Amino acid sequence: MFKQLRPALASLLVLSLVTGVAYPLLVTGIAQLAFPEQANGSLLRDAEGKVLGSRLIAQKFDGEEWFHSRPSAGDYATVSSAASNLAPSNPALAERIARDAAQERIADQGPVPLALVTTSGSGLDPQLPPQAARYQALRVATARGLPLRLVEDLVESHTERPLVGPAVVNVLALNMALAGLKR
C-alpha cells in the first residue's frame, strides 16, 4: 500500500511547491520588474509620500468642493463590494436614483449624467465618464471660489483616453489635483 501511496504523496509535494511557491514567486518577480507601479496596487501618494488611495478603487467624497464618485452599493468598502442587484422594476432602485439625482442636480445643467446615479458592477469603480466630471465642475468651482474655466481645464487634463474603450476620469487623481490648487 505504501508503494502506491508514495508516488501520490511525492506528486502532491512537488506540485504544491511548484504551484504554491515557485510559480507565485516567479510571477511576482516578473510583475515587480515589468510593472512595479501596478504590481504594488497603483497607489496615489501626496507630496510627502503618504498613500492616499489606489487608482483602482473608488473613494467616497462628500461635500460640494469635491468631485463625487459613482454611488457604491457597498458604501465603498472593498470587503462588501458588489452591485446593488436591484431589478430595474424595483421601487427601491427608483427611489435611490431619484435621491442621488436630487443631490447631484445642478440648476441649468440639464439632466444628471447616468454615471452619477447608478452603481457600477463592483460598486468600487474609480472612474467617471468625462461628461459626468464636467457636469460637476460648476458646483466644485463655486464651492471652492475658483474660476469655472480652471476647473474644466483640470477635468480635461485628467481625462484618460485609452487605446480601446471610452475616455474616463479617475476621481481620486482629479480630487488630489484639485486639492493642490490655490484658492
Swiss-Prot record:
Per the record, the GO terms for biological process are: potassium ion transmembrane transport
Keyword field contains Nucleotide-binding: yes
- The yes or no answer to whether the keyword Cell membrane is present is yes
What are the recorded GO MF terms, alphabetically?
ATP binding; P-type potassium transmembrane transporter activity
Subcellular location, record wording: Cell inner membrane
- State the PANTHER family in the record: POTASSIUM-TRANSPORTING ATPASE C CHAIN, POTASSIUM-TRANSPORTING ATPASE KDPC SUBUNIT
What protein am I looking at? Potassium-transporting ATPase KdpC subunit
Q: Which organism is it from?
A: Pseudomonas aeruginosa (strain ATCC 15692 / DSM 22644 / CIP 104116 / JCM 14847 / LMG 12228 / 1C / PRS 101 / PAO1)
